[in-house]
């Protein structure tokens, strides 16, 4: 049985999906990276990730991709037929709408497409079950094919069976995802001698943290796991203990009126505010949901609670889902290949939000992808700022040797001058990425924010990310707006939310910041070690808000 079938547009939005088992939705992100963003081409429209095999078929003219995900290799016998059928059924049903450059909504797909698809899927599965894969005891070709199936299933997870040579330390495997042998970036570098290390091996381990959150794709890229409560967690539709118990007293089979919704939406607004969503945004969110539900008929098989639950989830997902690609690795490689210059990333933010630590985490991840990193120390005012960066760089050198360096020109220098010199140095020494640390500044201090505008105007940066704390309340909105306004004729490129591990379910600040300036969350920080960096799972955030 297939584990997941999904219809996804090229923007990464899931139009419709059917799951038959718990599936880590990270696999869809990996598929899009491998199939459409990576320079390496996929073979037979197939991508492997973790324990999953993914096959896809694209309706190129409409930018729609049909995806089937499975673990049981028997599914390979009919997966392509299922994709072909799904492709033809979907285009026949919605051709007129697609020709008008419209996309059917989930309800339309569920009503028209799902019944036909389910019958076809069951038919193909039953036909496969009546047959067995041809295995002949004396047929070498059959045995070879069977072995190929087994190797494909294991993929990058296949284990070394040869015993290590005597006297050599046995290499460690990190939850079947990345080995030290495959990814030297995630362990002690052979280039750094023990004499030059600033910390011993036991200290290095505590600094690095839990590396199994970094996962290796088929093309060799090391990607960061989504923020989830558990690495195997999948998104649940449970709502018994959620805020939507507020709607249990409404009866199905009626047209919803404003008087039905207003009292309960007021309670919902209070619930969101308690989750750290700014009051103004919680109010606007509730008003938006109310407008979408008034005069909507709720059938007897579609409870009011589920209807309102879905409306809130859809709106929150719309707010948090990025409208552009967040594939930083692809952007870096594109600039290096096409423009032959270092890629520049600057971190900005108020004092004390963890910019230096966040920069070190990003550096560690980029080093794991074999980029050469130059760290530019542009906080030339805060006492000890350069030394703090120096500690991080020395630690990372202990892990990766000369692949990372610190560029510093002392205190009191103009940050724009330092960046200009850093870029020249990076060009001369073949660095791939420059990570720029900047001075912390109060967002309501016009003098300090004015210097940020001067810095942005004088330096042509590829990305500017604002680092912000998860637990700052409604002040986060003011921070986001002021930093956005202080950049010279360009928007912020994204947020990095630090200290998310300290807020539990109070994740509403993320909604507020994204909503305030319409830029996405690139990463979230969940601790102090170099591997405590995650990408945002929109579904996870919505689940936390709705609990």
Curated annotation (Swiss-Prot):
Keywords noted in UniProt: Endoplasmic reticulum, GTP-binding, Membrane, Nucleotide-binding, Receptor
The keyword Heme appears for this protein: no
GO cellular component, one term: endoplasmic reticulum membrane
Residue ranges of the region described as Disordered: 124-174
Compositional bias ranges of the Basic and acidic residues kind: 142-153
Subunit text: Heterodimer of an alpha and a beta chain.
Domain notes: The NG domain, also named G domain, is a special guanosine triphosphatase (GTPase) domain, which forms a guanosine 5'-triphosphate (GTP)-dependent complex with a homologous NG domain in the signal recognition particle (SRP) complex subunit SRP54. The two NG domains undergo cooperative rearrangements upon their assembly, which culminate in the reciprocal activation of the GTPase activity of one another. GTPase induced rearrangement of SR drives SRP-mediated cotranslational protein translocation into the ER.
Family the entry assigns: Belongs to the GTP-binding SRP family.
Protein name stated in the entry: Signal recognition particle receptor subunit alpha homolog
Biological source species: Schizosaccharomyces pombe (strain 972 / ATCC 24843) (Fission yeast)
């Amino acid at each position: 049985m297939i584990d997941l079938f999904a219809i996804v547009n090229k923007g990464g939005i899931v139009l419709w999906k059917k799951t038959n088992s718990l599936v880590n939705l990270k696999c869809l992100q990996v598929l899009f990276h491998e199939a459409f963003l990576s320079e390496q081409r996929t073979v037979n429209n197939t991508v492997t990730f973790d324990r999953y095999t993914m096959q896809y078929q694209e309706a190129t003219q409409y930018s729609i991709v049909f995806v089937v995900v499975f673990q049981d290799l028997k599914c390979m016998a009919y997966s392509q037929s299922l994709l072909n059928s799904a492709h033809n059924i979907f285009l026949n049903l919605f051709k007129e709408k697609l020709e008008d450059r419209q996309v059917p909504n989930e309800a339309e797909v569920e009503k028209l497409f799902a019944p036909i698809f389910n019958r076809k899927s069951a038919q193909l599965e039953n036909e496969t079950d009546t047959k067995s894969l041809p295995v002949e005891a004396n047929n070498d070709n059959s045995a070879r094919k069977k072995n190929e199936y087994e190797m494909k299933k294991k993929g990058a997870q296949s284990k070394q069976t040869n015993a290590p040579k005597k006297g050599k330390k046995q290499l460690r495997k990190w939850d079947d995802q990345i080995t030290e042998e495959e990814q030297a970036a995630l362990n002690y570098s052979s280039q750094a001698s023990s004499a030059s290390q600033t910390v011993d091996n036991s200290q290095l381990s505590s600094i690095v943290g839990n590396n199994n959150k970094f996962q290796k794709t088929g093309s060799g890229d090391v990607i960061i796991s989504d923020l989830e409560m558990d690495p195997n967690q999948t998104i649940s539709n449970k709502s018994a203990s959620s805020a939507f118990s507020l709607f249990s007293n409404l009866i199905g089979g009626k047209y919803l009126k404003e008087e039905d919704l207003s009292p309960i939406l007021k309670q919902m607004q209070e619930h969101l505010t308690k989750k750290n969503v700014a009051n103004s945004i919680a109010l606007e969110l509730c008003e938006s949901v109310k407008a979408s539900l008034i005069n909507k008929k709720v059938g007897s098989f579609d409870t009011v609670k589920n209807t309102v639950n879905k409306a809130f989830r859809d709106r929150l997902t719309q707010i948090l889902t990025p409208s552009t690609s967040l594939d930083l690795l692809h952007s870096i490689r594109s600039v290096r290949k096409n423009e032959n210059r270092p890629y520049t990333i600057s971190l900005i933010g108020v004092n004390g939000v963890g910019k230096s630590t966040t920069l070190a985490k990003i550096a560690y991840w980029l080093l794991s992808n074999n980029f050469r990193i130059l760290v530019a120390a542009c906080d030339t005012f805060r006492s000890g700022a350069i030394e703090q960066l120096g500690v991080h760089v020395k630690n990372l050198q202990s892990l990766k040797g000369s692949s990372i360096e610190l560029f510093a020109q002392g205190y009191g220098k103009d940050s724009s001058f330092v960046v200009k010199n850093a870029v020249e140095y990076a060009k001369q020494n073949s660095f791939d990425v420059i990570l720029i640390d900047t001075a912390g500044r109060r967002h309501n201090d016009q003098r300090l924010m004015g210097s940020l505008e001067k810095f942005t105007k004088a330096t042509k940066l590829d990305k500017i990310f604002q680092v912000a704390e998860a637990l700052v309340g409604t002040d986060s909105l003011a921070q986001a707006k002021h930093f956005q306004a202080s950049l010279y004729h360009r928007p912020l490129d994204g947020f990095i939310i630090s200290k998310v591990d300290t807020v539990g379910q109070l994740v509403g600040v993320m909604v507020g910041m994204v909503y305030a300036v319409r830029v996405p969350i690139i990463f979230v920080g969940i601790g102090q070690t170099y591997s405590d960096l995650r990408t945002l799972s929109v579904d996870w955030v919505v689940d936390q808000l709705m609990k």
